[in-house]
C-alpha cells in the first residue's frame, strides 16, 4: 500500500533522511536546435538534443491497473514549450471528444506548469487524452478553485501504436506531442523564460478504465491517495541553452 508519512515518525530518521525524502526532481530543458513539427511522431532531429527522458513513477500500490511505462522529454525555444510523451499501453481508450471535457477520466497525459514559483499554489493544467482532446485550466489553490482558461495556439498531436477503444486486441502504446506558446503563461509570467530560469511543473498520466485505473507521476506529491494537484511538490524545470 502507498506509504503514509506521519510527522511523529521523523524523529526516527537519520539526519539526512528527511532532506532526501522532501527533495523534488529537476529536469534541464534544452533549447531546441532545429524546428519541431508537432505530429506526434517524436522523430524530429531536435528531440535528439533533449535531456534523457524522465520515467513516471508508480506510487499508489492500492491501484489495480497495469503498470505501463511512460517517458517524457521537454524542449524550449523563443516561441513555445515542447513536451513529448511516449506511453506504453496495451489497451488505448478515450471516450471524450470535446474541448474541456474531463479528459482525465480517459487514458490521459498531463503537464502542470507554474512559471512563477513565488506563487506556490497557482499553476496551469494541460490534460490531453489519447484522441488529442485538451482540458486546460488555471488552478489557484491546488484543491478546488479551477478557473476556466482556454489556451490559444497550442499544437497537439497524438500517434497510436494500436487501435482506439478496441478491447479485443492488444495495443503497444501511444505518443503525445505538445507545443504550448509562451503567451499562454502571461497571467503568471509576463515574459518567456531565459536560460537559467527555473519553473515548477509536474508530469502525470492516468491510464486504464475503472475499476482498473492507475496514475503515474514525475514528482512525488507525498499524498496517501492518487492526487497530483500539489504544486508545493512540483519538480523543477531548468531552462538551458
What are these model-predicted stretches?
Residues 1-11:
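Bacterial N-terminal signal peptides that target proteins for export
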Residues 21-241:
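Structural preference for beta-rich elements and adjacent junctions enriched in aromatics
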Residues 11-20:
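Hydrophobic h-region of N-terminal signal peptides that target proteins for export
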